[in-house]
Amino acid sequence: MKDPLDFSGKVVLVTGSSRGIGAEMIKVFDKRGAHCVVNYVADGQGQNKADAANVAKELNDPLVIDCDVTQPEQVESMMMEIGDKRGGLDILVNNSGIISDRTIKKMSTEEFESVVRVNLTGTFTVTQKAAAILRNGGRIVNLSSVSGQMGLFGQANYSSSKAAIIAFTKVSAREFARQNITVNAIAPGFIDIGMGKGVPEEAIQSFIKQIPLGRLGDVNEIVDAALFLSSPMASYVTGHVLNVNGGVYMG
């Protein structure tokens, strides 16, 4: 019997895959046989490009594409390149996201909108443009967050964007079903990687006290969730939010 987690021949795009959870995801998809697309957005210091290059060194013949997910023209160009060079797309993981915490009283409109623009509008734009090259039977996995389910202090922008991704996932699941494309979301809890790095130790211990399983999540537990939702094992799962949070939110 074929390994359901063998992605040989599948084309996989993980947005924001130059570092953090996205980088770990694309590495595992590669190890399981997928043709991988690494996405990053250029920054003034060239750090994101360098990070993407380092990830690409560990992969087998990847595409590496500079694309700002908030710019429709760039996203459309990325999809055209994937279509031209790989013939289509089988699995899309909308992972790109930013965080910028501040209380509502202190948060500027730009601080609110910039996070929503990347996290939510970026997910919409990539999904919309990917529709042109997504093959029948494909998979879309969106990264939400426990913050979007609970509403965390100081995260009006981030929580709002991640809550909206859940609604967007459900709408997308209905609309893409006619192409037998499933659309699901993962809602990570407090994970020991990526944007959580640099959090003060006392804050981390405070988080842990809220988690029934008594520990932070490991990035591989998020990767495993993405693998499952992208695999034939989840062929009858769509419009679902998979909580990977140690029990901090049960709903």
Give the role of each language-model region:
Residues 145:
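Residue(s) in the substrate-gating loop at a strand-loop-helix junction
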Residues 18-19:
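Conserved glycine-rich cofactor-binding loop
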Residues 127, 161, 169:
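Active-site helix of classical SDR
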Residues 66-77, 109, 221:
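The beta1-alpha1 cofactor-binding region of Rossmann-like NAD(H)/NADP(H)-dependent oxidoreductases
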Residues 2-3, 150, 209-210, 227, ...:
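Short C-terminal tail/terminal secondary-structure segment
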Residues 103-104, 111-113, 196, 207:
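Substrate-binding pocket helix/loop in short-chain dehydrogenase/reductase
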Residues 132, 174-178, 235:
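Alpha-helical segment proximal to the catalytic Tyr-Lys
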